[in-house]
Swiss-Prot record:
Catalyzes the attachment of aspartate to tRNA(Asp) in a two-step reaction: aspartate is first activated by ATP to form Asp-AMP and then transferred to the acceptor end of tRNA(Asp). The modification Phosphoserine is found at S241. Residues 243-246 are annotated as: Aspartate. Keywords: Aminoacyl-tRNA synthetase, ATP-binding, Ligase, Membrane, Mitochondrion, Nucleotide-binding, Phosphoprotein, Protein biosynthesis, Transit peptide. It comes from Rattus norvegicus. This is Aspartate--tRNA ligase, mitochondrial. ATP binds at R265, D266, E267, E534, G583, L584, D585, R586. The modification Phosphothreonine is found at T218. It catalyses: tRNA(Asp) + L-aspartate + ATP = L-aspartyl-tRNA(Asp) + AMP + diphosphate. Residues 1-46 form a transit peptide. It is found in: Mitochondrion matrix; Mitochondrion membrane. It comes from the Eukaryota. Its EC number is 6.1.1.12. Homodimer.
Length: 652
């Protein structure tokens, strides 16, 4: 009987009209097309149910409904709560003998079993309504029930308040996905991507184009994953971004490109990164930096969740030099102050030795931050941690100065600070009672970077003491501009490397410096920062083949043969173009307030890059490797061999 009724319902669902579709003329596409966000979705079409568990209300009283879902919990064999991805509803289990089979099915099915229940929507008895549930005014009086799949004992309960280790969650990811938080995160992600696609493609004429996943190794950037081919010694690589392809699409006249792109970077064990990730990839012809910024601001405003405060555009901006000097980083969190102040002039005639030594050197400076109420809330062990952090990570000394409630200065160096220096320092730093000043000295960039780190450490410490510095409901966007085009290599300071990638165009006002002082050239690169996190980066590209060849070959010492296809394309009439990539995982993580990007990805890797559910990466037998002309040799060192846990299929 259940199969027959199910087929009848399915037939009705298939015959139901999906909705009228318009056939607009191409020229008026953006004016005529009905956006999908304006339609009411039908969640029960084409399936064996009439409604979802979360949609029933008092307006449905008396209706006969069929629901499908998981048994959330059962109480005294009288009620059970049925759950699907749309919500919860209470099922009243019949107690009369005529419905014994229904009662047996619903009472004997283990929790998390999948059932289909048909019945009548009735009002809950007066006083038994549950205001915490959207369906709390009604319940379903069950008439028929079918066990679709019984559930075995679970490794953990599917309840948000049940604490589970991340390793266990990743091992049983398909169970973790049933939680309301994961459901919310993934559905919000889907909605944001849908709105982004509408904004770009429907409203602004972008073309959604897939680019290849199998490519070749290219110079610069992050390490790439290699994919063997059947030709001896020849490998593909998984692209770290569609950078070259989207530039070639501009050469091909596509004008406006967009893609929800999968990208791959072999960066090893990093807790905040994934070896595979998703970015909203954008490229435009005949655009400048301002045009890209306006596009992205409109894109985020359009796709922003409705339950959040609307974004205010344009976003503020600052140069890389300003960000470093003020916040000590190129991705500042501007939700709170504690800005870096240059106090070199205050201590020009100081008797404090390490300040004297720093100011005597070229580009030597004295910098400080004021930690409001730091003297009141930070403890002795906190200050010791700060000083050790500075010494270990930056090989620099930090001088703490406290102003207590009686306006007395407390510091190991207090006796060496003159009254004039105190007054000027108080004025510049706007020091108040119970504040703490952290002071350091050295080369400008190093001193700023140290204080930028300490600024965040102090914010963390103060928030653990109960001070609210960073409002989680506030979304503070910032454009950072005018990055250096090149950086000195760490391993060889006399050589240059690209600060971002070698295709970034130099600032028009600095092109002449390419041939004399390339280290001073600014690039037309821009980063989008949200609450101290880089969520996007892009640039105006080099569209002149001669300039691109000069930068690759002469300045970066790269083998231009690896990029001959791109250089040739630029020679064939490449338009001026630029673009940006937004990190979708990071953006959704910040919007949802998730603790990790792994909480907004359906099937993420662990921080070591492993899939704990399937145990990937896995070993491969010699027979499977033979067509690729690959032989695995294990390390000879016994400890390395033990840590590698070799498979029985692979021998040295």
């Amino acid at each position: 009987m259940y199969l027959g009724s199910w087929l009848n319902r399915l037939g009705r669902g298939l015959s139901r009209p999906i909705g009228k579709t318009k056939q607009p003329i191409w020229g008026s596409l953006s004016r005529s097309l009905t956006l999908s966000s304006q339609r009411v979705p039908e969640f029960s079409s084409f399936v064996a149910r009439t409604n979802t568990c979360g949609e029933l209300r008092s307006s449905h009283l008396g209706q006969e409904v069929t629901l499908c879902g998981w048994i959330q919990y059962r109480r005294q064999n009288t009620f059970l709560v049925l759950r699907d991805c749309h919500g919860l509803v209470q099922i009243l289990i019949p107690q009369d003998e005529s419905a014994a089979s229904v009662r047996r099915t619903l009472c004997e099915a283990p929790v998390e079993s999948v059932v289909r229940v048909s019945g009548t929507v009735i009002a809950r008895p007066l006083g038994q309504e549950n205001p915490k549930m959207p369906t709390g005014e009604i319940e379903i009086k069950a008439k028929t029930a079918e066990l679709l799949n019984a559930c075995k004992k679970l490794p953990f309960e599917i309840k948000d308040f049940v604490k589970k280790t991340e390793a266990l969650r990743l091992q049983y990811r398909y169970l973790d996905l049933r939680s309301s938080q994961m459901q919310h995160n993934l559905r919000l992600r889907s909605q944001m991507v849908m709105k982004m696609r509408e904004y770009l493609c429907t409203l602004h004429g972008f073309v959604d184009i897939e680019t290849p996943t199998l490519f070749k190794r290219t110079p610069g950037g992050a390490k790439e994953f290699l994919v063997p081919s059947r030709e001896p010694g020849r490998f593909y690589s998984l692209p770290q971004s569609p950078q070259q392809f989207k530039q070639l699409l501009m050469v091909g006249g596509l004008d406006r490109y967009f893609q929800v792109a999968r990208c791959y970077r072999d960066e090893g064990s990093r807790p905040d990164r994934q070896p595979e990730f998703t970015q909203i990839d954008i490229e435009m012809s005949f655009v400048d930096q301002t045009g890209i910024q306006h596009l992205v601001e409109g894109l985020l405003h359009y796709s922003w969740p409705e339950d959040k405060d609307p974004l205010v555009a344009p976003f503020p901006s600052m140069t890389f030099a300003e960000a470093l000097a003020t916040y000590g980083t190129d991705k500042p969190d501007t939700r709170f102050g504690m800005k870096i102040v240059d106090i070199s002039d205050v201590f020009r005639n100081t008797e404090i030795r390490f300040l004297q030594d720093a100011l005597a050197k070229p580009q030597g400076t004295v910098k400080a931050i004021c930690v409001h109420e730091g003297a009141k809330y930070l403890r002795k062990e906190d200050i010791e941690f700060i000083r050790k952090f500075a010494a270990h990570h930056f090989s620099q000394e930090v001088l703490p100065i406290f102003l207590n409630a009686r306006k007395n200065w407390s510091s190991p160096f207090a006796k060496f600070i003159t009254e004039e220096e105190r007054l000027e320092l108080t004025r510049l730093m706007e020091i108040q009672e119970d504040d703490m000043v952290l002071l350091t000295a050295g080369q400008h960039e190093k001193a700023c970077s140290l204080l930028g780190k300490l600024r965040l450490e102090c914010a963390d410490l103060l928030e653990t003491r109960g001070l609210a510095l960073r409002d989680p409901a506030l979304f503070s966007f910032l454009w950072v501009l005018d990055f250096p085009l090149f950086l000195a290599k760490e391993e060889s300071p006399t050589e240059l490397e690209s600060a971002h990638h070698p295709f970034t165009a130099p600032h028009p006002g600095d092109i002449h410096l390419l041939y004399t002082e390339p280290e001073k050239v600014r690039g037309q690169h821009y980063d989008l920062v949200l609450n101290g996190n880089e969520i996007g980066g892009g640039s105006i590209r080099i569209h002149d083949a001669q300039l691109q060849r000069y930068i690759l070959e002469t300045l970066l010492k790269e083998d231009v043969k690896l990029l001959s296809h791109l250089l040739q394309a630029l020679d064939y009439g490449a338009p001026p173009h630029g673009g940006i990539a937004l990190g979708l995982d990071r953006l959704v993580c910040l919007v949802t307030g998730a603790p990790s990007i792994r909480d907004v990805i359906a099937f993420p890797k662990s921080y070591r890059g492993h899939d704990l559910m399937s145990n990937a990466p896995d070993t491969v037998s010699p027979e499977d490797l033979k067509p690729y002309h690959i032989h695995v040799s294990w390390p000879t060192d016994s400890e390395e061999r033990a840590s590698a846990t070799p498979s029985k299929y692979l021998s040295s």
